[in-house]
Amino acid sequence: MMNFYCRTTFKTFLFFLILSIGVVSSVFAAHTFVPWEDGVFVAIGKEHGLEAEKRIRTIMDVIQANHEKPVMEKLKLTNDYLNNIPWIADPDLWKREDYWATPFETLTTFGGDCEDIAIGKYAMLRLMGIPDDALGFAYVETRDKERHMVLVFKENDASPLYVLDNQVPDVLTGPERKDLLAIYVFQNNGKLYIIDNKGEKRSVKKEFMGRKFEKWATAKERARENRKKYEKYNGGRPLFPND
């Protein structure tokens, strides 16, 4: 685990990050969780093995059991649960330099790096009813000048921003994470904000981010194709909200 350090620009970053996430209703219009049919898990087991099937069953049971819990419990549970996934570098796991895995790939292979685990947390929270607009991905720099990705959550304008980090066991607020310096933040809907060296925000089109946003878009498309493949075992019903 890396050691972290303080950066004075983090508070400025937090302010802009809050703006970029935007304001969502404090009363979530949560989607109703509908458990997947058993045929989905059986099909996964046939294709990826019984251990993979067991992992998918277990996480869906956890999601179902905690769907109505308070938001903070969902955040802590998600962070704890997915931080147990072994950290494996992309060249070792995928034989590629920078591969963004889907949550399904991360769970079936049981490994991933910071991007993969952040994406997994995003998917788990969405399945537990957390709205898309409350979540974002922050690309940051650590004390060792390592590039790192975390998931961030902000419920409404008056609430704190929380950071879910695969290197830190606790879900901490932005002001408590003085150890991180932001580079950019983006959301699933394509909103992207670049933070410059002075801590100033510049809004840009998603195309400007180029390769990184391309990887997110590609991972989403693979995830969508994979879900569609298994929908026939789920009575034709979508496996993920807003599919």
Residues of each region from the PLM?
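Bacterial N-terminal signal peptides
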Residues: 12-23
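A structural boundary/capping signal
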Residues: 27-243
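Bacterial N-terminal signal peptides that target proteins for export
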Residues: 2-14
